[in-house]
């Protein structure tokens, strides 16, 4: 089974993916590292630009029939059995990205993406089985337990649980207006 864990930068993808893989006994794959290792994509202005079609094809070939948790904000473009879209309060994302040294423009871009559900919409366009999980105020262990419970219950689709419209005014200073 291939489980793709995706979301806006700062939601906790890597922490959750590693813990989920460990609990399930699955292989953990960081998509950025995988793409670099395979020579998929190129560096442009300090950012790795990845050819999504090439990534999907190579990943499908290399991990077909294996149990894998794929971690990355592009993982929802893979042929996955289940896509987990992690969400977090945009203000929390802004704070985390600020700590990581993100510039104002990139920070605003990501806060806006979370605010308007960009990754969730992309995931739904690409996949049938999409589960949305809000990580706000939860420990990584609590998030993984929630995911495992949903998997055990056979839940294939759960979306629409997050609405950030109430925090719009709080994140306004971070947006690129």
UniProtKB/Swiss-Prot annotation:
The record's section on SUPFAM superfamilies has:
P-loop containing nucleoside triphosphate hydrolases
GO process annotations (BP): ribosomal small subunit biogenesis; rRNA processing
Reaction catalysed by this enzyme: AMP + ATP = 2 ADP; ATP + H2O = ADP + phosphate + H(+)
Region: LID; residue ranges are: 99-109
**Positions of ATP binding:** 10, 12-15, 100, 138
Q: Which Gene3D superfamilies match?
A: P-loop containing nucleotide triphosphate hydrolases (3.40.50.300)
Does 4Fe-4S count among this protein's keywords?
no
The record ties this protein, via InterPro entries, to:
Adenyl_kinase_AK6, P-loop_NTPase
According to its UniProt record, the EC number is 2.7.4.3
What keywords sit in the KW lines?
ATP-binding, Kinase, Nucleotide-binding, Ribosome biogenesis, rRNA processing, Transferase
Does Transferase count among this protein's keywords? yes
Q: Where is this region: NMP?
A: 30-50
A Pfam short name: AAA_18
- A molecular-function term among this protein's GO annotations: adenylate kinase activity
Tell me where on the tree of life, at the top rank, the source sits. Answer: Archaea
Question: What family is reported?
Answer: Belongs to the adenylate kinase family. AK6 subfamily.
Q: What does this protein do?
A: Broad-specificity nucleoside monophosphate (NMP) kinase that catalyzes the reversible transfer of the terminal phosphate group between nucleoside triphosphates and monophosphates. Also has ATPase activity. Involved in the late maturation steps of the 30S ribosomal particles, specifically 16S rRNA maturation. While NMP activity is not required for ribosome maturation, ATPase activity is. Associates transiently with small ribosomal subunit protein uS11. ATP hydrolysis breaks the interaction with uS11.
Assembly mode = Interacts with uS11. Not a structural component of 40S pre-ribosomes, but transiently interacts with them by binding to uS11.
Q: What is this protein called?
A: Putative adenylate kinase
């Amino acid at each position: 089974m291939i489980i793709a864990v995706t979301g806006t930068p700062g939601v906790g993808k890597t922490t959750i993916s590693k813990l989920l893989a460990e609990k399930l006994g699955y292989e953990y794959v960081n998509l950025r590292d995988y793409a670099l290792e395979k020579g998929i994509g190129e560096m442009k202005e300090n950012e790795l630009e990845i050819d999504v079609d090439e990534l999907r094809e190579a990943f499908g070939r290399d991990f077909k029939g294996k149990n894998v948790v794929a971690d990355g904000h592009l993982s929802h473009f893979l042929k996955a059995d289940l896509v987990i879209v992690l969400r977090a309060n945009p203000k929390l994302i802004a704070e985390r990205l600020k700590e990581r040294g993100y510039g104002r423009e990139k920070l605003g871009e990501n806060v806006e993406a979370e605010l308007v559900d960009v990754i969730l919409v992309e995931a739904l366009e690409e996949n049938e089985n999409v589960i949305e999980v809000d990580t706000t105020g939860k420990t990584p262990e609590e998030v993984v337990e929630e995911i495992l419970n949903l998997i055990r219950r056979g839940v294939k689709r759960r979306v629409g649980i997050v609405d950030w419209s109430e925090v719009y005014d709080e994140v306004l200073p971070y947006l690129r207006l």
